[in-house]
Amino acid sequence: MPNIELLEKSMPVAPIRIAALAGCRELAEEVDKKLVKFRKELVAAKKSTIIPQGYAEKSFLVDCECPRFGTGEGKGYIKESVRGTDLYIMVDVTNYSLTYSVCGHENHMSPDDHYQDLKRIISAATGKAHRINVIMPFLYEGRQHRRTKRESLDCALALRELSAMGVSNIITFDAHDPRVQNSIPLKGFDNFFPTYQFLKALVKNVPDFKLDNDHLMIISPDEGAMSRAVYFSNILGVDMGMFYKRRDYSTIVNGKNPIVAHEFLGDDVHGKTVIIIDDMISSGESMLDVTRQLKDRGAERVFVCTTFGLFTEGLDKFDEYYEKGYLDRLITTNLTYLPPQLHDKPYFIEADMSKFLALI
């Protein structure tokens, strides 16, 4: 049960409605169930009989879709009125499981396709909804947040575009670099972290998990994850260490300078449980290399906590490292699409974020 007192003090801007794009519908339904439950409890706990219109509903979900023409072109369609509402549009730009037909050929939806559908729904609601908010757990083009060569600034461009379309607030999780919000200084940009949900999942699923400096250590897999590891270690009061990547800057492979080695900086990990924390697992190669090195250094158990499990190269390598004893647990959230077979893996733990989203 949420903190009723905090919810009671908040006054809604307008009646809430949730428009979930197809790739995020499952998560949105869970959020809707919890939001309905929270508000029913709040109404029951209130002594006052004055309840704002639209505050307690059987569901806050709005029926919407983005159908396609035979050529693959799409359109946004909201099937019920959202006039005067506080509209939250939920989108998962990483959900590659959805497909659509292009001239008879099946095409998997890319992040670009999801982003275009988001703009279509915004366009359908602009000028009608009282306020438009976008919940985009994985920030579109979040890894293209800066320019180091002759390249585009896709994330900043997307944020500016959404702002220009009338979006008041953008809600995301564990942005690769939250400083990208500087591109829209006059709009709301909320960046949340699933730290509590990681701890909750670990304590619930690992019975002998010990939260003290003698048994636990937090590890940053690279320089970019340092702020996350520092925060995690500070709230737990334990030591932290980090790896940094040595790259070969003379060559480029798949658009990146290849990693030559991971070098470790930190105290002895021998006999300790270590938690590696980062914002995402893409292919997972560098993360798995870090787990191997930590086990080689004598770590008793290695847990990986990552907000987004993308698994772009599949799960075979993770299975291999689990069987070899390099990886003990992998904790990731349900904020983005997860392959169904992942739920059957003995090392996988899901950190449920639906309650947190409902409270937001």
Model-derived features with residue positions:
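PRPP-associated nucleotide enzymes
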Residues: M1-I360
